[in-house]
């Protein structure tokens, strides 16, 4: 029997989400594809999407490290908008929040952006619901533009943070 971990399969669309990128952009081990399917479906349903109105995800292939063996995936867009654009919207909302003097206004601003911003919501869903790799001596393999402020491993290098400013990376 072949090693199940060596078989690479595309990340499949779910009921409430669609993979909009070509299948070869996310050829992963079955374990990673299944974990992504579970988390993406839960994220999509919680964000209000369904079979009649699915959310889209766009993957791009990576070329180093875990990507070489299908153990890592990079998500570049959710809902047709790039992760970098979602991050820019998040930062703009927080800048507006810093100008708010009223604690109630603060809660409204952060709450509204947290509901609207699919990039941030996706990062938090991947963080909360996924089981990602953590090689000995290394951080949990979830990186993206929110890692320094929201991530499970906030003390990452500038180089690593900069490399993941426009996408979310997970590995299993």
Q: What is each stretch, according to the model?
A:
Residues 76:
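Active-site proximal helix-loop segment of RNase H-like, two-metal nucleases, encompassing DDE(D)
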Residues 54-73:
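Cell-wall polysaccharide-cleaving catalytic domain and substrate-binding groove, primarily
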Residues 34, 38, 53-56, 124, ...:
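Intrinsic-disorder/low-complexity peptide segments enriched for small residues
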Residues 5-7, 23, 46, 62, ...:
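Catalytic cores and adjacent binding grooves of peptidoglycan-active enzymes
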Residues 1-52:
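Active-site acidic/histidine clusters and adjacent loop/turn architecture
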């Amino acid at each position: 029997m072949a090693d199940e971990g060596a078989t690479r399969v595309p990340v499949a669309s779910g009921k409430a989400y669609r993979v909009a990128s070509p299948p070869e952009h996310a050829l992963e081990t079955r374990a990673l594809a299944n974990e992504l399917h579970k988390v993406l479906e839960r994220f999509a349903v919680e964000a209000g999407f369904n079979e009649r109105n699915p959310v889209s995800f766009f993957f791009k292939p990576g070329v180093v490290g875990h990507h070489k063996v299908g153990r890592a995936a990079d998500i570049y867009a959710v809902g047709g908008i790039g992760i970098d654009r979602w991050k820019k919207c998040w930062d703009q909302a927080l800048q507006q929040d810093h100008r708010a003097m009223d604690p109630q206004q603060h809660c409204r601003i952060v709450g509204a952006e947290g509901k609207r911003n699919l990039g941030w919501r996706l990062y938090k869903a991947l963080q909360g619901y996924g089981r990602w790799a953590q090689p000995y001596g290394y951080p949990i393999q979830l990186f993206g533009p929110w890692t320094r402020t929201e991530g499970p491993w906030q003390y990452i290098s500038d180089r690593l943070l900069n490399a993941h400013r426009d996408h979310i990376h997970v590995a299993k």
